[in-house]
Regions:
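Active-site adenylate/phosphate-handling loop in enzymes that bind or generate adenylated species
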Residues: 72-139, 182, 187-195
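Structural element of the ATP-grasp superfamily
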Residues: 21-25, 76, 221-222
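Short secondary-structure boundary/capping segments
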Residues: 24, 49-53, 99-114, 207-210
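A conserved beta-strand->alpha-helix junction
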Residues: 18, 22-57, 97, 147-151
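Short, solvent-exposed loop/turn segments at secondary-structure junctions
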Residues: 13-15, 39-42, 93-97, 102-103, ...
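Adenosyl-5′-phosphate
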Residues: 83, 127, 131-346
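ATP-dependent adenylation/pyrophosphate-handling site
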Residues: 1-28
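A conserved donor-nucleotide-binding helix/loop in the catalytic core
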Residues: 64-80, 165, 176
Length: 346
């Protein structure tokens, strides 16, 4: 296999993703580094001149900056754990190609129209703050229409195609892949092999039923990748749920079916959402596996956080404040439904 490989991951100590990363690196015999993330580290980093410079460099007036890797790359470089000529190879956007962004219920009998696509896109990509629908709804819908132009939506396959096209154009290209700016910021090069043109062309020809729930990807990994010299990787925790007919796969199907059932009973669905949201509000600051809500003080976070926000909600405000600080208060007051609460905290 490939030699001279350094693997790294990051987050709170003991987080599940870090453990999976360690297992895979050790199984393949690669060097592995873990960078611990804490609320305190994030707060210290968020208010430095370096972070302000990174916002300007990475956002480039196109997207909010992607900050997830910045603590790790900074610390690895400062401690000499990666050579100056290192080339970073992240996995963007393998999950997207395999079908991870297609709504899981697109194999169910339901209406599939352009309106369905608009609703899915607004829910997924315009939900980080509670905004004034009368003011911003037409604007956001116009942006979505412009991105996909005159795409036809008439069944589940064409609706999934529209969902993915908008995601490719607006999320993957402008935000996810733009995360490589952090490597450049610290003087490193990068490659994104999963955006190879041949691979993209192949998945453009894959039918919905093989993309939905990542059916083709899972089957390929088990039957073609984790075989021969790499068959032992099938026993790692992170790969066991790829196997056909295993209990985890069955459990996931049951969860999806339960969610679909609850969606048809609004009272039960709303009750479940309220219970889940209350729990998140009281635990998110200290339990997030990346600890990154530490970019703001705990008391400010608890004033603002309603359960719908994520780190990009806050980074978006920070970024707007960096590029045009004077109008921020006016923008928040005009377009945010909880403007006074948000402004009092920030």
């Amino acid at each position: 296999g490939v030699e001279d490989v350094i693997c790294f991951t990051y987050g709170k100590k003991g987080n599940r993703e870090a453990e999976i990363s360690r297992q895979v690196a050790e199984a393949l015999g690669y060097q592995w580094h873990f960078v611990e993330y804490t609320n305190e580290k994030w707060y210290a980093c968020a208010h430095t001149d370096d972070m302000k410079a990174y916002y300007s460099y990475a956002g480039n007036l196109v997207s909010i900056p992607h900050i997830q890797d910045i603590l790790a790359v900074k610390e690895l470089k400062e401690e000499g754990n990666i050579p100056e000529n290192a080339v970073f190879v992240p996995g963007h956007s393998g999950d997207m190609l395999a079908g991870s962004w297609i709504p899981q219920d697109y194999d169910k009998p339901q209406a599939y129209t352009f309106g369905t696509f608009l609703e899915e896109s607004l829910k997924k990509h315009y939900s980080l703050w509670k905004w004034n629908e009368a003011e911003l709804g037409p604007l956001f819908e116009g942006k979505i229409r412009k991105s996909v132009e005159d795409i036809s939506v008439h069944d589940n396959e064409s609706c999934a195609n529209a969902v993915e096209l908008f995601n490719y154009n607006e999320r993957q290209a402008k935000f996810i892949v733009n995360s490589v700016r952090v490597y450049e910021f610290f003087g490193f090069r990068w490659q994104i092999p999963l955006w190879d043109a041949e691979l993209i062309d192949f998945f453009l020809r894959v039918s919905l039923m093989l993309r939905l729930k990542q059916v083709l990807y899972r089957d390929y990994v088990v039957k073609k990748l984790l075989v021969g010299a790499f068959e032992f990787l099938q026993d790692l925790e992170c790969t066991t749920d790829l196997k056909a007919n295993n209990k985890d796969g069955t459990r996931n199907e049951l969860i999806l079916d339960l969610k679909y059932f609850l969606s048809k009973i609004p009272l039960l669905e709303n009750l479940g959402k309220k219970v889940y949201t209350l729990r998140r509000i009281h635990t998110a600051y200290d339990t997030h596996p990346l600890a990154w809500y530490g970019v703001i003080p705990r008391d400010s976070f608890l004033k603002i956080y309603s359960g719908r926000e994520n780190i990009n909600s806050f980074v978006g405000l920070f970024y707007v404040n960096e590029v045009c600080p004077a109008p921020l208060n006016g923008v928040v007051k005009k377009y945010f439904t909880d403007a006074e609460r948000i402004l009092s905290a920030i």
